[in-house]
From Swiss-Prot:
E.C. code: 6.3.2.1
Species the sequence originates in: Bacteroides fragilis (strain ATCC 25285 / DSM 2151 / CCUG 4856 / JCM 11019 / LMG 10263 / NCTC 9343 / Onslow / VPI 2553 / EN-2)
Family named by the database record: Belongs to the pantothenate synthetase family.
Originating gene: panC
Enzyme class: ligase
Protein name, UniProt field: Pantothenate synthetase
Pathway it works in: Cofactor biosynthesis; (R)-pantothenate biosynthesis; (R)-pantothenate from (R)-pantoate and beta-alanine: step 1/1
Keywords: ATP-binding, Cytoplasm, Ligase, Nucleotide-binding, Pantothenate biosynthesis
Binding-site positions, (R)-pantoate: Q61, Q153
Residues given in the record as ATP binding sites: 30-37, 147-150, 176, 184-187
Main location: cytoplasm
High-level lineage: Bacteria, Pseudomonadati, Bacteroidota, Bacteroidia, Bacteroidales
Any Gene Ontology biological process: pantothenate biosynthetic process
Length: 282
């Protein structure tokens, strides 16, 4: 595996491989890689002859500068993991490389980006779209891989690809969890042992809510989850919404649509964790 730091060098490598008819997969990451990222990389390696993994902590998607400073940066460990997964290139640019001048582009995909994360993290998805569109333009991959843990992000990126007419396939990949059910996240490394124990209640509550939902209404299921999280000291619910998996708009009853997802964000201490669960999938 080669580690590349500039767009020019990456494009020089890829142009040769694309000329040979090789398919290129892109896995955009912010580093601090774990088994969830590894599953995306392995899938790309399985489906494409060339896999590029970007490792870049994107400053424009952090609405909380403190979160940006605290975000773990572990490039050496990341490269070892990527090599073990069979990646062809790790693309680790500087901020100056990706943003030679400030990116003033405004992306708006209402109503997808105005709810949930969009409401609580203003500017976040604009920053995501800025960097992902830059990566798509730099790499011009045949496929790009994103995890379903960031469910709203995946929906917005699909819409961006549709509107900007990028010629590539977006591949959503299932959430990877610890053996006990906690959704893998780079932010989990910031949890104390006690916080880690509390955080487990998030996924446990979601799994229980799926059983509960089979015999209860949407509003009863919302209350079930809200009450369960409120009962755990050290957890603070930011939001839990039950939405149409395509439009991300709230649903009032289970029969409203064939694709229903519950999306949750919880503060565990000062660490913000997200997760989701599918109640119905067509």
């Amino acid at each position: 595996m080669k580690v590349i730091h500039t767009i020019k060098d990456l494009q020089a490598e890829l142009s040769v491989l694309k000329a040979q008819g090789k398919k290129v997969g892109l896995v955009p990451t912010m580093g601090a890689l774990h088994a969830g990222h590894a599953s995306l990389v392995k899938r790309s390696v399985n489906e494409n002859e060339v896999t590029v993994v970007s490792v870049f902590v994107n400053p424009t998607q952090f609405n909380d500068k403190n979160d940006l400073v605290k975000y773990p940066r572990t490039l050496d460990a990341d490269c070892k993991l990527l090599e073990a997964c069979g990646a062809t290139y790790a693309f680790a640019p500087s901020v100056e490389e990706m943003y030679p001048e400030p990116d003033t582009r405004q992306f708006s995909y209402a109503p997808l980006d105005t709810v949930m994360e969009g409401a609580f993290r203003p500017g976040h998805f604009n920053g995501v779209c800025q960097i992902v569109s830059k990566l798509f333009e730099a790499v011009k991959p045949h496929r790009a891989y994103f995890g379903e843990k960031d469910f709203q992000q995946l929906a917005i990126i699909r819409e961006m690809v549709r509107q900007m007419q990028f010629d590539l396939e977006i591949v959503g990949c299932p959430i990877v969890r610890e053996e006990d059910g906690l959704a893998l996240s780079s932010r989990n490394a910031r949890l104390s042992a006690e916080e880690r124990e509390n955080a487990l209640k998030i996924s446990q509550t979601l799994f229980k809510s799926r059983t509960f939902a089979a015999t209860h209404t949407v509003s009863e299921t919302l209350k079930f989850v809200e009450d369960a999280i409120a009962a755990v000291p050290g957890l603070r619910l930011e939001y839990f919404e039950i939405v149409d998996g395509n439009t991300l708009q709230k649903v009032d009853n289970w029969n409203q649509t064939s694709y229903v997802v519950g999306c949750i964000t919880v503060f565990c201490g000062d660490v913000r964790l997200i997760d989701n669960i599918k109640y119905k999938e067509s």
